[in-house]
Amino acid sequence: MSNRGRLGDAFLRPGSSSFLDFLSDHAPELLPGRSAAAGNAPLAPHATTIVALTFQDGVVMAGDRRATAGTMIASREIEKVFPADDYSVIGISGSAGIGVDLARLFQLELEHYEKIEGSLLSLDGKANRLGTLLRGNLPLAMQGFVVVPLFGGYDLDRGAGRIFSYDATGGRYEEHEHHGTGSGAIFARGALKKLWRPGMDAAEAVKVAVEALYDAADDDAATGGPDPVRRIWPVVTTVTAAGYRRVPEDELATLVDALLAVRTERGRLA
């Protein structure tokens, strides 16, 4: 009888609930940080600014759309914010290609766990898993291919939105109220400090996130602001008890038009 089309023994053998463990055993060359030769990092696209903030019902995460390679704009439409699962979201800054792969692997890790265990991993558990994945990229980070993610989600046990930041070694740190990462984060975080307030609703939090990215783009060449001419808007997402939601582009267009009208009226003081 032909074995053609049948899954191999590795796929049928009971094992860990971690997809990372499975990949480490059977295809380690596919993991981040396992295939680079020593040497200087070539000029590769970099993703830039990500912001996140909590609001009354959950968390908002947003990212600009620009990727740079040195002084050149490599892309005006890259997406840096992705759903990790139904109740969490990940944003990536740093080496764009590796960051996108890391986000996809993290999605698979959470999906694999849910299929094996029959339940969702806790938000703290998800944050820890992301730190483990990031630590696997350390050899590449030592060569200049650094990825720094931002993770947020709705904690079903606490009934609140939470935010986690990371360093290049996989260290995990819980942030309160708001945070930003990437080249424009210093400017975005200044805006968040001024605009964030307790008890905001989702619409207010989305507006604050867009304003923070606008301020970052105003001072950081590697961060792209809203582009009304090309109709390119930031990726803005919310996560609440109802789950993950990406804010539609028509809503963002209306919000940006209002924001630009106010700032145009202020002139040089905007």
Curated annotation (Swiss-Prot):
The active site is at T48 (nucleophile). GO terms for molecular function: threonine-type endopeptidase activity. It is found in: Cytoplasm. GO terms for biological process: modification-dependent protein catabolic process; proteasomal protein catabolic process. Pathway: Protein degradation; proteasomal Pup-dependent pathway. Its main location: cytoplasm. GO terms for cellular component: cytoplasm; proteasome core complex, beta-subunit complex. The keyword Protease applies. It is an enzyme of class 3 (hydrolase). Keywords: Autocatalytic cleavage, Cytoplasm, Hydrolase, Protease, Proteasome, Threonine protease, Zymogen. The keyword Hydrolase applies. It comes from the Bacteria. It catalyses: Cleavage of peptide bonds with very broad specificity. Its EC number is 3.4.25.1. Signal peptide: none annotated. Pfam families: Proteasome (PF00227). The formation of the proteasomal ATPase ARC-20S proteasome complex, likely via the docking of the C-termini of ARC into the intersubunit pockets in the alpha-rings, may trigger opening of the gate for substrate entry. Interconversion between the open-gate and close-gate conformations leads to a dynamic regulation of the 20S proteasome proteolysis activity. Belongs to the peptidase T1B family. The 20S proteasome core is composed of 14 alpha and 14 beta subunits that assemble into four stacked heptameric rings, resulting in a barrel-shaped structure. The two inner rings, each composed of seven catalytic beta subunits, are sandwiched by two outer rings, each composed of seven alpha subunits. The catalytic chamber with the active sites is on the inside of the barrel. Has a gated structure, the ends of the cylinder being occluded by the N-termini of the alpha-subunits. Is capped by the proteasome-associated ATPase, ARC. This is Proteasome subunit beta. It comes from Xylanimonas cellulosilytica (strain DSM 15894 / JCM 12276 / CECT 5975 / KCTC 9989 / LMG 20990 / NBRC 107835 / XIL07). The lineage of its organism: Bacteria, Bacillati, Actinomycetota, Actinomycetes, Micrococcales. The gene is prcB.
